[in-house]
Amino acid sequence: KRTFEPEDIGPNIQLHMNRCILCYRCVMVADQITDNRVHGVMDRGDHSNISTCISHAIDNEFSGNMIDVCPVGALTDKTFRFKSRVWFNKPYDAHRDCPTCSGKTTVWMFGDEIQRVTGRKDEFHEVEEFICNGCRFDHKELADWTIEGPRAFDKDSVINQNNYTRKLDKVEIATEDHI
């Protein structure tokens, strides 16, 4: 089992290397949308890990987009950690006039409070447009956003149903088939 010590990579992003599958998506996104590369894959083989160069913090204007492209949750939003479960929040498409990015986002709300802000994703769950850190981390007030409407999800999505009360038609356990 691979275990890693926690590493602080910035004021807004938490890295959990124990979850990382070394897909390099965060490294590629940071390299493509920013001018300076401050993190990458360190060491070789079984000792490989994602880290910043000489323990510098990742502080560029679009660094939060690495959270959206991480497929396993190894990079998480420090401003949203342990606030609530994702399936308790309702996603809404929203936008704002931002001089740095497009401002088109999905805001995740619990009641009237914005819990987190993410980039909009298409039907393949890929980020449509990257958003700046100002939109993602700094603007958590409802007055900062123009709400366009609720976000559409697949009919069987836990987030769309927002509960676990739907009864199953039939439950079959075929233990003899697996013995």
Regions found by a protein language model. Give the residues of each.
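N-terminal export/assembly segments and adjacent metallocofactor-ligating motifs
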Residues: K1-I179
